[in-house]
Amino acid sequence: MSRRGTAEEKTAKSDPIYRNRLVNMLVNRILKHGKKSLAYQIIYRAVKKIQQKTETNPLSVLRQAIHGVTPGIAVKARRVGGSTHQVPIEIGSTQGKALAIRWLLAASRKRPGRNMAFKLSSELVDAAKGSGDAIRKREETHRMAEANRAFAHFR
């Protein structure tokens, strides 16, 4: 048994303009090659575009989109007796938000469009409305978990 203690969970810092942790999590996931200022630019432009499209509070749209995409359950591959089973496991809120952000960014990168800010804003608005690729990904994950419910006792 390990003698090492459990790692302290780091809380995400908030971003300088909106003072929001979700925005900072989004910035850190969109980041490529250490260009954080560019990541901030993309996020802030996307937030402005959301403001123009919906004429509501863009942070509430962001919160609603992430809440809509966050999965409650996922499947994990587990090897039992020579065969690999997809075992459904519950996901905590922090891990769920991280997955949701990852799916939102992947879906927005796939989208056709002018630039990343435009694609991200479109995906966030769609996710807040309950449509889009990220929502489809969450539903697919939930369907997989439901289909493999018989293997839940392998946890």
Curated annotation (Swiss-Prot):
- Write out the function statement from the record: One of the primary rRNA binding proteins, it binds directly to 16S rRNA where it nucleates assembly of the head domain of the 30S subunit.
Q: Which one of the record's GO molecular function terms can you name?
A: structural constituent of ribosome
Q: What are the protein's UniProt keywords?
A: Chloroplast, Plastid, Ribonucleoprotein, Ribosomal protein, RNA-binding, rRNA-binding
- TM segment ranges: none
Instruction: Please name the Gene3D superfamilies in this protein's record.
Output: Ribosomal protein S7 domain
Q: Which domain of life is it from?
A: Eukaryota
Supply one GO BP term: translation
Q: In which family does this protein belong, per the annotation?
A: Belongs to the universal ribosomal protein uS7 family.
Specify where it is mainly localized: plastid
- A single Gene Ontology CC term: chloroplast
Quaternary arrangement and interactors, per the entry? Answer: Part of the 30S ribosomal subunit.
Q: Where in the cell is it found?
A: Plastid, Chloroplast
Pfam families xrefs: Ribosomal_S7
Is Ribosomal protein one of the keywords? Answer: yes
Keyword Plastid included in the entry's annotation: yes
Its recorded name reads Small ribosomal subunit protein uS7cz/uS7cy
